Amino acid sequence: MTFKLGLLSFWSLWHGIVLLTNLCEGLKVVRVLPARWTFASKNYDAIVRATEKYHPAPWIPRLLFSGVLIWQFLILVGFGWAMVASVQSGWMDLEHVSIAFGLSLSLLAAFIIVDELCTEYDTEHGHILFFIAQLVTVIALAVLPRG
């Protein structure tokens, strides 16, 4: 259980950091945080650059970024729920774990599709690696023995 809980904790922490850096990025965009603030993801600018070839309305990148923030918040809630349920039950609560990883993998799948649509192949490579790493983790959590 300790190894599995460690894997779940790692991905929970990683998702928390990702959400926090994206929140800081969003706060920079709306000028709540100063432009010199360094703890920010730069993902909003990446969305603007990736979509500019399609000449979207100015509000489209903000809507996309806001949607990602909401999705990432739900992922973090899912991982928190999976952690609490697993600790309380004394073993991996695979139902809650599956929900958390399902939310995360679905966001990564959406990123991969959008990367392809926007021909952002370098970015897509990173998303594919995260997708594979999370898929391997969820399989390990399901297949490895309880002990």
Segments from the language model and where they lie:
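Extended, low-polarity transmembrane helix blocks
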Residues: 1-21, 63-70, 74-147
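Long, hydrophobic N-terminal alpha-helical segment
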Residues: 1-56
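Short alpha-helical interface elements
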Residues: 31-34, 38-48, 58, 89-92, ...
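Select transmembrane alpha-helical segments in multipass membrane proteins
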Residues: 55-64
